[in-house]
Amino acid sequence: MTVYTCSPDLASILTCIYEAWNSRLGYRNVRLMTEPVGNLELFCDYCHVEPDTEKAASVTRSIQKKIGAAAWRLVYLCAMSERSDAPDIIYRFLLYGFSYGKDTLHMLQEPAVFHAFEVSRQVTNEAHSFWEFIRFANISSGFPILVSHISPKANVLTLVAPHFSDRLPSENWMILDDNRQLAVVHPADRPFYLTRLSPDEIERLSLTESTSDPYEELWKGFFTAIAIKERSNPDCQRTHLPLHYRDHMPEFKKFLES
């Protein structure tokens, strides 16, 4: 068994798929995974793959041409999951895709296709949740800017940003992914862009969560006022609003700090 390993970014995953396909070893004899690799398995050869933009672009063109735009979006969402087995899930989906074309998207009876849809749905659901759960703090540093921190399981910044770009087109805002040291920056009335933050920038921007904002007290007051003690149902609340979303929500801060 040959195990191809790569970084969890999209270009690396697509390059890894290109190398596995080009090896001609056969799908039964290869496995793909992202790094870092945990425990090494006996009788496996591990092959690290460096990202190559030309090879990644070649895979992208093949997907769009032979399977279609919907399949490319599915592949993109799976890659954004940042699961260690994401490259392998995409690779096995593409085995069917390059054989059956656009019909592959309707072959949910095949485990490889169903698994790809399942992972992409998890990523989409998390992105949609952040549409509702993101909270902005108003920061004044020469000019007003709205700043929000999130800690998503998947890399959903590029999926969340278009929603707020449409809702807040004339505002300066930032959404920071604390887990990946990435940020989406939206200048007022201009397109947003994705940037990687330096350690100094991360440290400075982390202070925004400790600033005082009167709207935070309004959120907390609203949250307390609408609660009915006799109908308190924490289990139901956790179902609709899982705990890992609450770290950056002001209405839950006093409960998390106590």
Regions inferred by a protein language model and the residue ranges of each:
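N-terminal ordered "arm"
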Residues: 1-53
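Conserved aromatic-histidine-acidic binding/catalytic patches
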Residues: 2-9, 47, 111, 145-156, ...
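Short, hydrophobic/amphipathic alpha-helical patches that form generic packing surfaces
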Residues: 13-23, 92-96, 159-166, 217-224
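Charged, alpha-helical interface segments at or near domain boundaries
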Residues: 33-131, 135
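Acidic, Ser/Thr-rich peripheral helices and adjacent loops at domain boundaries
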Residues: 46-55, 190-204
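Short coil/turn segments at secondary-structure boundaries
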Residues: 73-78, 178-179, 232-238
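Internal, well-folded beta-alpha domain core
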Residues: 103-196
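Long, compositionally biased intrinsically disordered terminal regions
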Residues: 172, 183-184, 188-190, 203-258
